């Protein structure tokens, strides 16, 4: 659809039961101008259309918990860079997981990417918790949010801070 792509992903166990379901929305961006562009027909044919999976679809934007606290600063390292020369989407999740207690059983992961980090940039990491949610904001040194990661958890013995 125009410059937007939608993808469902299912991972099944050996018996065929769904163990992970995911939905994602993507913007097709011109890497030179960093502007959305219409999806080219040959790209569209590489991803055939299918029916949406029956599942809960979260809103596109993550509503932030109000009291975010800075917990760390990190530099983007070469191994976190993908083929587009920016921080790989998975690296944001892996980084957030470093600040999650092993007592938290993660039930859902959401992420909202606003602008990519590149090698050598400083990531200001902020964290907030409320009930069963743990959120991270990855911002630049000017305070601009680049990515939000949210975990929905089941508490397994730890107290909320």
PLM feature segments, named:
Residues 1-60, 114-119, 128-161:
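HotDog/MaoC-like acyl-thioester-processing domains
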Residues 6, 71, 108:
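Short coil/loop residues immediately preceding or within conserved phosphate-binding loops
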Residues 18-21, 68, 105:
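A short, structural micro-pattern
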Residues 66-78:
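Short amphipathic
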Residues 88-106:
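Active-site helix/loop of acyl-thioester processing domains in fatty-acid/polyketide metabolism
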Residues 102-127:
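A conserved acidic, glycine/proline-rich C-terminal tail/linker
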